[in-house]
Amino acid sequence: MSPRGQFEGKSNEFITIVITIIIAVSGVSGALIGSLFRPNQSADSFVDEPFGDPLPIRFESQPFADYEEYETDFTLNVSSYDINSDLSNIINLDSFSYLPENARNAIVDHYFFAVPSNFKMFADIYCMNDDYELPSFVTSDSVLHAYHVLYDLALREIEETHFMNHIGNLSRHMVNVSLDQYNLLESDLWRALAKKNAAFFSVAAKLHDPDWTVPDPVTGWVYQTLHFIENAGGFTTDWFMNQRLDFSQFIPRGHYTRTESLKRFFKTIMWLSRVAFRVQPDDDGLTAEQNAERAENETGQAVLLCRAFEQPSHLFIDGETPLRLWRELYDTTSFFVSTSDDLTVDEYLTIFNAIYDDPVNIVELCNRTKLGTFIATARESRSPQIISGWVWDSQSINVTKGLRFMGQRFVPDSYMFSELTHAAVKYRMMPKALDVMAVLGSQRAWDLLDDQKDYLNYTTQMNRLKETYGDLNLSNWTQSLYWSWLYSFKTLLDEPELGHPSFMLTDQWIDKQLTTCLGTWTELRHDTILYAKQSYSQTYGASYPPPGYVEPVPKFYAKLASLCRMMLQGLDSRGLVVDDFTERLVRLHDLLREFQVISEKELSQTPLNATEWSLLENIGGILAHIEGTYNEGGRAALVADVHTDPMSGKVLEEATGNPMVILVAVPNEEDKVFLARGAMYSHYEFAWPMSERLTDEAWWQMLEEESAPSMDDWMGSFVLGISETSDLSASHNAYNDPEMRRNSSSKAYRNVMPIAIDVRKMAKPT
């Protein structure tokens, strides 16, 4: 299986779907696909498959915004330095007299260390530096976190001020038109399909507005389904479309727990994105003939849905507004995240308009031969790439192919997970975040995955993914904000060369950067939890120190600044600009450009000017302004489930905790060494029951109660206080052990609560 067509080199068209369906002409027009009717059945019952040849269709779209990368210009010229065993060559040691022996040893050995803290926000650490007149070490973590805050805020603002109304009006319009179709159609079969559409959109309308009155014809279906959504218990087929749907996905999480409005929006979009109108299902317990009939029924619903977009209702008297609203929502979220992994409304409308000459004509709309052509054409369209539901390892992913009204998006990390778990990698049911980092180029991540390499086909699959993603060009990597975020931070996985500061040339710094990438990736998954398509395993001295030091990664700052510019231009082009947010994003963009220049000077041993020193002196207040208030930015700690294993009923949770304090021995312009203090991510990975998918609030409580899992043991190379043997490594391996998985009472299989580590007092100056 190859990755999405986004890999084919089309210039940064994040919503581009350019697909040419190549049709093999059989030489016999109207080839028999299957008998239209069963013998002795009424003409209102679909059976087998109707006649029809697929049509050649081309789908195109336009880019939302362009990406243009800032250039960097520097020469690596930093002299190496060592730390005296008694730290006597650190010119501001008096400011850190509280450091215990293990912290001092870490500075001597590898120039820096990190410790957990009780700080709730990154900016708090830098503001305390200002208060205590301590030099700030400006980390890549701090600006990545600032970008996350603004990305999340922008998405939240747009959802509440624009999309909440859009999706409500669109759902109610589709209910009204579907009921009109139900009353107008003469065929009992097609009336039943219109009724199911009315129920489908009534669920969405009721989730959006609890006070909305459900129409009488579909009341029973709708309230039964709402019961499953509210209980969020897991997989069931006991609802009106009889698909096996994972209702645990309806637990609001991410930023969608902030307000009741966002909770309702989350459930509404989740409903519209998870249910498929499939073209070739293979459902359990059904014969091939029955599955073919189900494909025809669901595709018939899709045909009526396409027609409904152009029908008037009392909400929209024209035939253009519904599709315009859908496109505004879809295109904007595609800009933030990615294009749909499943076939979209636009793609189905293209097929619909190519097949039906007069869609207003009900007789033609119900034409069985045209429906057969529709099914054949849709089956020849692009396939999904990410398994996101219950699929047996003996089945093709194409059993999920079909229309989803607001399909979840193809994101590369979910694709990596789907290609590195069962059935692509036999019996590996849970992936690891390190999988993503290894594919993105981290040799250290690959080394840390040694215990996974015994899985059959794991190394082969990993090498294939490395080659695939290694061949991507700039246009591929910058097709959306999500992709560009990955592109920006993967620069940090490059191993530093001679000429970088000594602290960057240590093995421990490579671990620090890997932790940074895991932290920002977790924030990315948290922010897009509603839209990103989640993967599923298939079943089965006397001198005074300078005011600060910028982590010298100029290429990273250039890429993140370019991403900010792309985001600004994309939102402005759609009139989605919020004044306060825009001002803060512009400030982050400008700050990143300044950090790029400062880090280029640091690497080239060029003195900073007074303006640049002033910037570092005030970095706490600047970052605090960008992050916003506690209510806007929230606690830095967050959690997101990124993969589901239906067999064990577990999800893989990725989380960041409170920001850690990092102390680094850095050089000044006079080749002297001083300690600078900054903030960095903490990162956690653990399995959790799918019926209890964690919210941020539940995760915060675990942190407060010190019942959170421990960080992975390899982070102990630079984080003081991590135990020698991580509970996570043992429990993660247990989840992937078939014998252990069958014995859920096994100690290693249960979620392990770590011991509390009392090192946080070191994070605060005395």
Name what the model sees in each region.
Residues M1-P39:
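Secretory targeting signatures
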Residues P39-P765:
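Long, non-catalytic protein-protein interaction scaffolds
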